[in-house]
Amino acid sequence: MRGCTPISETTGTMSIDVIIGRDGKPRCAWAGAGDTAFGRYHDEVWGTPTSDESAMFEALTLGVFEVGLSWSIVFGKRDAFRKAFRGFHVAKVAAMTERDVDRLVQDASIIRNRGKIQATVDNARAMMSASPSLVALAKSNEITRKRAPRSVADLPKSTPQAEALAQQLKSQGYRFVGPTSVYAFMQNVGVVNDHVHGCFRATDYPTTARIR
C-alpha cells in the first residue's frame, strides 16, 4: 500500500503483518495507512474494551451479517446498518415488528437476508430479557494475553472461551452465534486483544514507546 512500510519487529525483514503508516505508527497490516475508516476502526474500536450496550449489540450484529460473507462488505455498510437498526438502541430494535423486517428486506443499503434481520431483532429481545447480560457474559470470558500474537497466522478462529460464550448466548435465545462469529465479536469489543506483535496497540508493545 502506498505510504506504508511493511516491517517485522523481531527479524527486521519484510512482513505483511505490521506496517508503518503515514503518521509513523506501526499497525496491523489490515488497517492500512491508518487514515481511512478501516484505520480508524483499528485504532479506536477493534480490541478496545467496552461496556457500552449499543456498541456490544452493534458488534454482535455485524458478526451475524458477516456469516458467509467478507468483513469488508459488512464493514462498508456500517452506517446503513446503524440507520436500519435504529442506532443499535437495544429496546428500539427489540420493538421492531414483522412489518419492519419486511421493510428492511427491501432495503438495498444493507444485506437483505431475512434470517439475519430477524435474528437481529430476536437478539435484541434476548438482550432485553437475559441475565447475566451480554456485557457481563463477555467480560466473564475475557482472554488475557501476556504476549501479542506473533503474526496473523497465529490468530485462532475460535477458542474455548468463545465456545463457552456461544453456548451461553444460545441458551439465552441468541441466534447466529457460532464460536467463530462469537470470537470475532470478542475481538471487536476488546474481550481479547489480537493486535499482532509490533502494532502500537498490541499488548506487548513497549510501554515507554507506546503511541497514543
Per-region residue spans from a language model:
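HhH-family (HhH-GPD) DNA N-glycosylase catalytic core used in base-excision repair
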Residues: 4-212
